[in-house]
Amino acid sequence: MASDPPPPYPGGPSAPLLEEKQGLPRMEEPRAAPYPQAMPFAPPDCGPPPYDANPGYIAPNPGFYPPPGPYAPMGYYPPTPGQFQPPYPSQYPSPGAQGTAVIVPPGPSSTSAATTVTSTTTTVTVLQGEIFQGSPVQTVCTNCQQPITTKISHDIGLMNFLLCCFCCFVGCDLGCCLIPCIINDLKDVTHSCPNCKYHIYTYRRMC
């Protein structure tokens, strides 16, 4: 008992010697695996992008996958916040929309829009004395502004008075001098409006 060696201290210098002494195989420490060598990095191609047949289509990034959901049609760009976006026309008509007529009664706005403003213009008619003679004339009344045919009346004028004086001078003084006063072709002609009785013109017969 006294000749036996003391037990080895774990981890001490005599531990491997004890294993060799007893004939046990020596365990080798595991070696660290070498790091893989880095692959050479190829520089990116800086050439022009490939030509796309659709100019309105924007190709997504190689590593980007669009989320599932409805998409806008090709060539459509979303409007800005201040821009009005018209609603999409419905592809399918709503049930009951076919054969339905909606009648909108005219309101005050439509009545005011249909009202036309007419300006009243004053027409100045220049009447010439030679057209107003012993017969009615078609003209426009200067008072009521209506197209009319004048109403004529015969009045004793200067022509009748001169012919009466001439008859008295030649000796027709026993009532024969009054004969020119009853002849309408020797009297003055007054033209008036048949509607408003307005005096338009007087045609005076001169010698």
From Swiss-Prot:
Zn(2+) binds at residues 141, 144, 193, 196. This is Cell death-inducing p53-target protein 1. May act as a p53/TP53-apoptotic effector. The gene is cdip1. Residues 18-31 have a biased composition (Basic and acidic residues). The keyword Zinc applies. It is a peripheral membrane protein. It is found in: Late endosome membrane; Lysosome membrane. Pfam families: zf-LITAF-like.
